[in-house]
Amino acid sequence: MWLLALVVAYLIGSIPTAYVVGRYLYGFDIRRRGSGNVGATNTLRTMGTIPGLVVLGVDALKGVLAVLLGQALGGPVLVILAALMAIVGHNWSIFLEFQGGRGVATTAGALLAMAPLALFWAFLIWLAVVIFSRYISLGSIVAAAVAPFLVIYFHRPWPYVLFTFVAAALVIYRHRPNIKRLLAGTEHKLGERS
Protein backbone atom coordinates (compact mmCIF):
# COMPACT_ATOMS: atom_id res chain seq x y z
CA MET A 1 0.00 0.00 0.00
CA TRP A 2 2.88 2.36 0.80
CA LEU A 3 4.45 1.90 -2.63
CA LEU A 4 1.15 2.70 -4.32
CA ALA A 5 0.73 5.81 -2.15
CA LEU A 6 4.22 7.02 -3.08
CA VAL A 7 3.63 6.45 -6.79
CA VAL A 8 0.31 8.31 -6.60
CA ALA A 9 1.96 11.18 -4.67
CA TYR A 10 4.69 11.40 -7.31
CA LEU A 11 2.09 11.47 -10.11
CA ILE A 12 0.08 14.17 -8.31
CA GLY A 13 3.25 16.23 -7.94
CA SER A 14 4.14 15.61 -11.59
CA ILE A 15 1.04 17.39 -12.89
CA PRO A 16 2.74 20.37 -14.60
CA THR A 17 0.25 23.11 -13.77
CA ALA A 18 2.27 25.98 -15.26
CA TYR A 19 2.90 24.01 -18.44
CA VAL A 20 -0.79 23.11 -18.80
CA VAL A 21 -1.89 26.73 -18.28
CA GLY A 22 0.72 28.05 -20.71
CA ARG A 23 0.16 25.44 -23.41
CA TYR A 24 -3.62 25.17 -23.35
CA LEU A 25 -4.71 28.67 -22.33
CA TYR A 26 -1.91 30.83 -23.78
CA GLY A 27 -0.56 28.66 -26.60
CA PHE A 28 3.10 28.46 -25.58
CA ASP A 29 5.52 26.21 -23.71
CA ILE A 30 6.53 27.95 -20.47
CA ARG A 31 9.84 26.10 -20.59
CA ARG A 32 10.71 28.33 -23.57
CA ARG A 33 9.68 31.62 -21.92
CA GLY A 34 11.10 33.72 -19.11
CA SER A 35 13.36 31.71 -16.83
CA GLY A 36 12.12 28.43 -18.34
CA ASN A 37 10.97 27.34 -14.89
CA VAL A 38 7.68 25.43 -14.70
CA GLY A 39 6.31 27.23 -11.65
CA ALA A 40 4.21 30.06 -10.30
CA THR A 41 6.84 32.83 -10.49
CA ASN A 42 7.60 32.24 -14.16
CA THR A 43 3.86 31.99 -14.81
CA LEU A 44 3.39 35.36 -13.09
CA ARG A 45 6.11 36.91 -15.25
CA THR A 46 5.06 35.39 -18.56
CA MET A 47 1.26 35.18 -18.24
CA GLY A 48 0.21 37.62 -15.52
CA THR A 49 -1.15 37.74 -11.98
CA ILE A 50 -4.28 35.59 -12.26
CA PRO A 51 -2.56 32.66 -14.02
CA GLY A 52 0.34 32.98 -11.55
CA LEU A 53 -2.02 32.74 -8.58
CA VAL A 54 -3.88 29.79 -10.12
CA VAL A 55 -0.61 27.90 -10.65
CA LEU A 56 0.52 28.78 -7.12
CA GLY A 57 -2.74 27.47 -5.65
CA VAL A 58 -2.83 24.24 -7.64
CA ASP A 59 0.86 23.52 -7.01
CA ALA A 60 0.33 24.08 -3.26
CA LEU A 61 -2.72 21.80 -3.39
CA LYS A 62 -0.46 19.02 -4.68
CA GLY A 63 1.49 19.18 -1.40
CA VAL A 64 -1.69 19.22 0.69
CA LEU A 65 -3.10 16.21 -1.19
CA ALA A 66 0.12 14.24 -0.72
CA VAL A 67 0.00 14.83 3.05
CA LEU A 68 -3.67 13.83 3.20
CA LEU A 69 -2.90 10.68 1.21
CA GLY A 70 -0.11 9.79 3.64
CA GLN A 71 -2.38 10.41 6.62
CA ALA A 72 -5.15 8.27 5.15
CA LEU A 73 -2.92 5.29 4.40
CA GLY A 74 -0.26 5.41 7.10
CA GLY A 75 1.41 7.40 9.84
CA PRO A 76 3.86 10.30 9.97
CA VAL A 77 6.59 8.46 8.04
CA LEU A 78 4.29 7.84 5.06
CA VAL A 79 3.10 11.44 5.32
CA ILE A 80 6.60 12.84 4.87
CA LEU A 81 7.54 10.33 2.17
CA ALA A 82 4.38 11.12 0.19
CA ALA A 83 4.99 14.86 0.57
CA LEU A 84 8.58 14.45 -0.61
CA MET A 85 7.42 12.38 -3.59
CA ALA A 86 4.99 15.16 -4.56
CA ILE A 87 7.85 17.67 -4.45
CA VAL A 88 10.09 15.34 -6.47
CA GLY A 89 7.25 14.93 -8.98
CA HIS A 90 6.83 18.70 -9.23
CA ASN A 91 10.57 19.26 -9.67
CA TRP A 92 11.17 16.33 -12.03
CA SER A 93 7.84 15.67 -13.77
CA ILE A 94 7.44 12.42 -15.67
CA PHE A 95 5.11 14.33 -18.00
CA LEU A 96 7.83 16.86 -18.96
CA GLU A 97 10.81 14.54 -19.48
CA PHE A 98 11.81 15.07 -15.83
CA GLN A 99 11.83 18.86 -16.03
CA GLY A 100 9.81 20.91 -13.57
CA GLY A 101 9.67 23.70 -11.04
CA ARG A 102 11.53 24.68 -7.90
CA GLY A 103 9.14 23.01 -5.44
CA VAL A 104 8.33 26.10 -3.39
CA ALA A 105 4.53 26.01 -3.70
CA THR A 106 4.29 22.23 -3.31
CA THR A 107 6.50 22.40 -0.22
CA ALA A 108 4.33 25.23 1.14
CA GLY A 109 1.21 23.13 0.60
CA ALA A 110 2.73 20.21 2.48
CA LEU A 111 3.74 22.53 5.32
CA LEU A 112 0.25 23.99 5.40
CA ALA A 113 -1.03 20.52 6.22
CA MET A 114 1.82 19.59 8.61
CA ALA A 115 2.88 22.79 10.35
CA PRO A 116 0.62 25.75 9.49
CA LEU A 117 2.13 28.12 12.07
CA ALA A 118 5.62 27.44 10.76
CA LEU A 119 4.37 28.08 7.22
CA PHE A 120 2.72 31.33 8.33
CA TRP A 121 5.99 32.66 9.79
CA ALA A 122 8.01 31.39 6.82
CA PHE A 123 5.58 33.26 4.56
CA LEU A 124 6.05 36.47 6.56
CA ILE A 125 9.83 36.09 6.25
CA TRP A 126 9.45 35.42 2.51
CA LEU A 127 7.24 38.50 2.18
CA ALA A 128 9.68 40.75 4.06
CA VAL A 129 12.62 39.61 1.92
CA VAL A 130 10.62 40.09 -1.30
CA ILE A 131 9.38 43.55 -0.25
CA PHE A 132 12.85 44.77 0.68
CA SER A 133 14.85 43.08 -2.11
CA ARG A 134 12.17 42.66 -4.83
CA TYR A 135 13.66 39.20 -5.53
CA ILE A 136 11.10 36.39 -5.27
CA SER A 137 13.85 33.78 -5.56
CA LEU A 138 15.81 35.26 -2.65
CA GLY A 139 12.65 35.27 -0.53
CA SER A 140 12.07 31.60 -1.38
CA ILE A 141 15.65 30.63 -0.55
CA VAL A 142 15.63 32.48 2.79
CA ALA A 143 12.18 31.14 3.75
CA ALA A 144 13.27 27.60 2.87
CA ALA A 145 16.42 27.93 4.97
CA VAL A 146 14.45 29.20 7.99
CA ALA A 147 11.45 26.84 7.70
CA PRO A 148 13.03 23.78 9.39
CA PHE A 149 13.88 25.85 12.46
CA LEU A 150 10.34 27.20 12.59
CA VAL A 151 8.99 23.64 12.50
CA ILE A 152 11.30 22.81 15.43
CA TYR A 153 10.23 25.98 17.28
CA PHE A 154 6.56 25.03 16.99
CA HIS A 155 7.27 21.54 18.38
CA ARG A 156 6.06 19.54 15.39
CA PRO A 157 6.80 15.78 15.31
CA TRP A 158 10.35 14.80 14.36
CA PRO A 159 9.31 13.31 10.97
CA TYR A 160 7.93 16.74 10.02
CA VAL A 161 11.21 18.37 11.07
CA LEU A 162 13.13 15.87 8.94
CA PHE A 163 10.77 16.49 6.02
CA THR A 164 11.29 20.24 6.25
CA PHE A 165 15.10 19.94 6.24
CA VAL A 166 15.00 17.70 3.15
CA ALA A 167 12.37 19.81 1.37
CA ALA A 168 14.32 23.00 2.13
CA ALA A 169 17.47 21.42 0.70
CA LEU A 170 15.55 20.48 -2.46
CA VAL A 171 14.14 24.00 -2.82
CA ILE A 172 17.56 25.60 -2.41
CA TYR A 173 19.17 23.04 -4.75
CA ARG A 174 16.58 23.80 -7.45
CA HIS A 175 17.35 27.52 -7.08
CA ARG A 176 20.97 27.09 -8.24
CA PRO A 177 20.37 29.05 -11.48
CA ASN A 178 18.69 31.83 -9.47
CA ILE A 179 21.60 31.94 -7.02
CA LYS A 180 24.03 32.35 -9.95
CA ARG A 181 21.91 35.17 -11.38
CA LEU A 182 21.60 36.83 -7.95
CA LEU A 183 25.38 36.78 -7.57
CA ALA A 184 25.83 38.10 -11.12
CA GLY A 185 23.20 40.82 -10.63
CA THR A 186 21.06 39.52 -13.50
CA GLU A 187 18.14 38.00 -11.58
CA HIS A 188 14.72 39.44 -12.47
CA LYS A 189 13.09 41.58 -9.79
CA LEU A 190 9.42 41.55 -8.86
CA GLY A 191 7.45 43.55 -11.39
CA GLU A 192 9.81 42.86 -14.29
CA ARG A 193 8.16 40.89 -17.08
CA SER A 194 10.07 38.31 -19.06
From Swiss-Prot:
Gene Ontology cellular component list: plasma membrane
Transmembrane segments annotated in the record for this chain: 1-21, 64-84, 112-132, 135-155, 156-173
InterPro entries: G3P_acylTferase_PlsY (IPR003811)
Domain of life (superkingdom): Bacteria
Topological relation to the membrane, as annotated: Multi-pass membrane protein
EC numbers on record: 2.3.1.275
Presence of the UniProt keyword Membrane in the record: yes
UniProt keyword annotations, A-Z: Cell membrane, Lipid biosynthesis, Lipid metabolism, Membrane, Phospholipid biosynthesis, Phospholipid metabolism, Transferase, Transmembrane, Transmembrane helix
SMART domains xref list: G3P_acyltransf
One of the GO biological process terms: phospholipid biosynthetic process
Molecular function GO terms recorded: acyl-phosphate glycerol-3-phosphate acyltransferase activity
Pathway: Lipid metabolism; phospholipid metabolism
Pfam family, one: G3P_acyltransf
Reactions accelerated catalytically: an acyl phosphate + sn-glycerol 3-phosphate = a 1-acyl-sn-glycero-3-phosphate + phosphate
Localization, UniProt: Cell membrane
PANTHER family from the UniProt entry: GLYCEROL-3-PHOSPHATE ACYLTRANSFERASE-RELATED, INNER MEMBRANE PROTEIN YGIH
Complex and partners: Probably interacts with PlsX.
General function of this protein: Catalyzes the transfer of an acyl group from acyl-phosphate (acyl-PO(4)) to glycerol-3-phosphate (G3P) to form lysophosphatidic acid (LPA). This enzyme utilizes acyl-phosphate as fatty acyl donor, but not acyl-CoA or acyl-ACP.
NCBIfam families recorded: glycerol-3-phosphate 1-O-acyltransferase PlsY (TIGR00023)
Family affiliation: Belongs to the PlsY family.
The protein, known as: Glycerol-3-phosphate acyltransferase 2
Species assigned in the record: Moorella thermoacetica (strain ATCC 39073 / JCM 9320)
Organism placement in taxonomy: Bacteria, Bacillati, Bacillota, Clostridia, Moorellales
Record gene name: plsY2
